[in-house]
Curated annotation (Swiss-Prot):
<dbReference type="InterPro" id="IPR000242">
    <property type="entry name" value="PTP_cat"/>
</dbReference>
<keyword id="KW-0963">Cytoplasm</keyword>
<dbReference type="InterPro" id="IPR000387">
    <property type="entry name" value="Tyr_Pase_dom"/>
</dbReference>
<dbReference type="GO" id="GO:0030866">
    <property type="term" value="P:cortical actin cytoskeleton organization"/>
</dbReference>
<dbReference type="GO" id="GO:0019901">
    <property type="term" value="F:protein kinase binding"/>
</dbReference>
<dbReference type="InterPro" id="IPR052782">
    <property type="entry name" value="Oocyte-zygote_transition_reg"/>
</dbReference>
<dbReference type="GO" id="GO:0004725">
    <property type="term" value="F:protein tyrosine phosphatase activity"/>
</dbReference>
<comment type="similarity">
    <text>Belongs to the protein-tyrosine phosphatase family.</text>
</comment>
<dbReference type="GO" id="GO:0007165">
    <property type="term" value="P:signal transduction"/>
</dbReference>
<comment type="function">
    <text>Inactive phosphatase which acts redundantly with egg-5 in the oocyte-to-zygote transition. Required for the polarization of cortical actin cytoskeleton rearrangement in the oocyte before and after fertilization. Together with egg-5, required for the cortical localization of kinase mbk-2 and for the inhibition of mbk-2 kinase activity in maturing oocyte until the end of meiosis I. Also required for kinase mbk-2, pseudophosphatase egg-3 and chitin synthase chs-1 localization to cytoplasmic foci after fertilization.</text>
</comment>
<dbReference type="GO" id="GO:0004860">
    <property type="term" value="F:protein kinase inhibitor activity"/>
</dbReference>
<dbReference type="InterPro" id="IPR003595">
    <property type="entry name" value="Tyr_Pase_cat"/>
</dbReference>
<dbReference type="GO" id="GO:0001556">
    <property type="term" value="P:oocyte maturation"/>
</dbReference>
<dbReference type="GO" id="GO:0005634">
    <property type="term" value="C:nucleus"/>
</dbReference>
<feature type="compositionally biased region" description="Basic and acidic residues">
    <location>
        <begin position="84"/>
        <end position="94"/>
    </location>
</feature>
<dbReference type="Pfam" id="PF00102">
    <property type="entry name" value="Y_phosphatase"/>
</dbReference>
<feature type="compositionally biased region" description="Basic and acidic residues">
    <location>
        <begin position="129"/>
        <end position="145"/>
    </location>
</feature>
């Protein structure tokens, strides 16, 4: 009997050893997932596994001591009794007799954060310890024994999670933070008051900032902003809107705002009245309120409510973009006839058929969604298995998708095909190569602007500019390249000759190699003089509601002291995610009765996107009805300005711009948006030679520095200036002809037979 009892006791001890080994050897992954049965940890018979780990201060908390083969020591029994009492206290706390945030420290857990008995949950562990028992803190009857075991199991899981997280934060803190960020991103929800494209607009506004900005000279980007420098900038920003906007919309100042800066803006006005202190006492509130008052935006949503700076400025940017008053009254007060388009007003009042227009727009959406093409998915196959190492094995069947963007790309390929090329003459640009930025982009002779100013003096009549006019447009555009150093005089001669009220520049002012500075930067700069007695002066800078554009008022003085006024709108419209700014500038130009000048670097990319979108919009408003109005608009534009719309990205952007303009009629095209995001993801994997630190990645730009769609054309011969005729007798026996030249195209007529 003694032998049997001894064997039974040893079996119990071995069971305790194996159970302790499994509990101690559980991996971090099982702790985080709540699974304590980890198959990766093998049980062991080593008695050392009974020692708590990790050991605290090098002393074991509990070790089994044997006085004989069959009895345990008295100290061991005391410790077992203490564990039982501790377990009983934990059950009492589980039933609601303790604080919510106080949890028991698991045996062997690190004690560097709190007392050994109790531990307060850290905020860093909220993402790991996120599950709570469904009935926790809500049980009114503590006598329900059925829920105690479930609550006990959940409590043990939480304890083990905390223990694992604490241990991991000591050993691998970077891994824990990375896991937390991944979980936060997975569960993140976009706030309703934020603008999805606000960051891109903010980045574009920073790009469009002044090159000689006073803020930039005081606080370089790579220099740390001190408290004294920040206080000086706040004092200077009270009277300077440009510095105020730089402080509010530059991310390096986000953490520098203090509540005491509000007192700087609490000055008395001319009447001696002191402004009311806002409920939101953060330091950036009063400066942002001054910006809102300047543009007529209601600021109570952040002055009376405590929200963060990022959310407030995103909402202000969106409200500035949605503002209907995008024009200044400077031109309308001086030349009211220049900003009143009688042709458009007459059509909208008397000729517009709203029902027919709505049918055209609905047909446009239906044709865009139905015009799909099969696109091969790169690197994916149905039978992606190679058997053996034979040179000639079974062919792999590629995967294809039927996509809307694929249909647009196919339409662009049809436009680029030499069969649809329209031959034109360009002798004037060939004779003035020094005035052309790119010799391969020719200027069409029949639509080019011939300079005739000044009368009686021949200074040359060539400028790389074309007139875009005729139905369905309501106004006239003049598309040109960015002025060069030797073409600034020709540019202003054209502006004076055509009586242009608006000049739209769609490139950055920080790239002098892509566009010459052809206007006075500030009112204090000297005027620009042009041969023929023309003088251009800066009359002031207007802060437009649209944060992307910088508006300069220019006064032109002619040879007979005649004065004309021009508004110069400059903005780097290169972000394909921004739909508001292009439509705002088109609304401004649509109401002009005189020709307006619009240019980018070569005059065939961003400017072409805006003009093509305007042609398609007017075509849907006025008619006639086309099955593919955007394709027809690009053909219409290329008949007047060849080489317009260079890449599929720009062609797709025109479709999205037109669909966004008619969103109140046709609703949102979710299928197009989803397909476009998928296409952007594939486009991001292509090679773009852009700055990795740029706020807008290269694959989202309309005209990046090195577009893969254009780079592949480098080294190829120039497109032949003739149209290839498609054979009209395909599938029939050819008739006999007298000569070979009657059936061969000019490219093949040089072959010898």
């Amino acid at each position: 009997m003694a032998l049997n009892s001894e064997v039974m006791f040893r079996e119990q001890i071995n069971a305790m050893r194996s159970q302790a080994g499994r509990k101690r050897a559980t991996s971090l992954q099982s702790f985080c997932s709540g699974n304590t049965d980890d198959s990766s940890a093998d049980s062991t018979d080593n008695m050392d596994m009974m020692v708590d780990y990790p050991q605290q201060k090098g002393v074991s908390c509990m070790r089994a001591r044997f006085n004989s083969e069959s009895t345990l020591s008295k100290s061991f029994r005391k410790k077992v009794k203490k564990l039982a009492q501790k377990d009983r206290r934990s059950k009492e706390r589980l039933n609601g007799n303790s604080e919510e945030d106080a949890i028991e420290v698991p045996r062997g857990a690190p004690s560097t954060y709190a007392a050994p008995s109790k531990l307060r949950k850290s905020k860093a562990l909220d993402c790991l310890v996120s599950e709570k028992p469904k009935d926790e803190g809500r049980r009114e009857d503590s006598g329900h024994g059925a829920d105690i075991e479930m609550a006990k199991g959940h409590f043990n899981n939480v304890r083990m999670k905390v223990f694992a997280a604490r241990t991991a934060m000591q050993v691998e803190p970077a891994l824990v933070m990375k896991t937390r960020k991944a979980l936060e991103m997975k569960n993140a929800v976009l706030e309703n008051h934020q603008s999805p494209g606000a960051f891109s607009l903010h980045a574009a506004y920073k790009i469009a900032a002044s090159a000689e900005s006073r803020v930039g000279s005081i606080t370089p980007c790579n220099k740390k902003v001190t408290k004294e420098a920040m206080a000086n900038l706040i004092r200077s920003s009270y009277d300077d809107t440009e510095i105020t906007q730089e402080l509010l919309f530059s991310s390096k100042f986000d953490t520098k705002w203090k509540g005491r800066y509000t007192d700087i803006y609490m000055r008395r006005d001319e009447n001696g009245k002191k402004p009311k202190r806002p409920v939101n006492g953060q330091g950036w509130v009063m400066p942002l309120k001054s910006i809102c008052e300047k543009f007529g935006i209601n600021s109570t949503f952040f002055t009376n409510h405590r929200i963060d700076l990022k959310s407030a400025r995103d909402q202000v940017l969106l409200m500035r973009l949605l503002s209907h008053d995008q024009t200044s009254t400077w031109i309308s007060d001086i030349h009211p006839e220049a900003v009143k388009n009688e042709t458009m007003a007459e059509y909208l009042l008397r000729e517009l058929d709203a029902s027919t227009m709505q049918k055209r727009v609905q047909a446009f959406k239906a044709n865009v969604l139905a015009d799909r093409d099969r696109v091969r998915v790169a690197g994916q196959f149905y039978n992606n298995i190679r058997i053996g190492k034979r040179m000639f094995g079974a062919a792999r069947k590629a995967k294809y998708l039927s996509t809307i963007i694929g249909g647009m790309e196919r339409r662009f390929e049809i436009l680029e095909n030499s069969v649809n090329h329209i031959p034109f003459t360009h002798s004037a640009s060939d004779n003035n190569q020094e005035k052309c930025r790119n010799p391969r982009v020719h200027c069409k002779d029949s639509t080019r602007i011939a300079l005739q100013f000044p009368r009686g003096q021949y200074l040359g009549d060539f400028i790389h500019a074309n007139r875009i006019s005729g139905k369905p447009l309501f106004n006239e555009f003049i598309m040109t390249q960015a002025p060069m150093k030797n073409t600034v005089d020709d540019f202003w001669r054209m502006v004076w000759q055509e009586e242009v009220p608006y000049i739209v520049m769609l490139t950055s002012r920080k790239e002098p190699e892509r566009c010459e500075y052809y206007w006075p930067k500030s009112p204090s700069d000297p005027a620009v003089t042009v041969p023929g007695g023309l003088r251009i002066e800066n009359f002031g800078v207007y802060q437009a509601p649209d944060p992307l554009f910088r508006v300069t008022h220019l006064r032109l003085i002619g040879p007979d002291r005649e004065e004309r006024h021009v508004e110069h709108w400059q903005g780097d419209v290169n972000n394909s995610s921004n739909m508001y700014s292009p439509l705002n500038i088109l609304r401004l130009l649509r109401n002009a009765s005189k020709p307006v000048v619009i240019h980018d670097h070569l005059g065939v990319s961003r400017a072409a996107c805006l003009v093509a979108a305007e042609i398609a919009i007017c075509s849907l408003l006025r008619g006639p009805t086309y099955k593919y109005p955007v394709q027809r608009a690009v053909q219409f534009l290329r008949q007047r300005r060849p080489f317009s719309i260079e890449t599929p990205m720009q062609y797709i952007f025109v479709h999205r711009l037109v669909a966004f303009f008619f969103r109140d009629v046709i609703g949102s095209a979710k299928e197009l948006d989803v397909d476009y995001e998928r296409w952007l993801q594939e486009r991001s994997e292509r090679m773009f030679l852009d700055d990795l630190a740029a706020p807008i990645p290269g694959y989202r730009l309309l005209s990046p520095r090195a577009d893969p769609d254009i780079v592949r054309m480098v080294g190829r011969p120039e497109r032949p200036n003739y149209r290839r005729e498609a054979p009209d007798c395909v599938g029939e026996m050819p008739n006999k002809v007298a000569t070979v030249d009657g059936i061969l195209s000019p490219a093949k007529s040089v072959f010898e037979f």
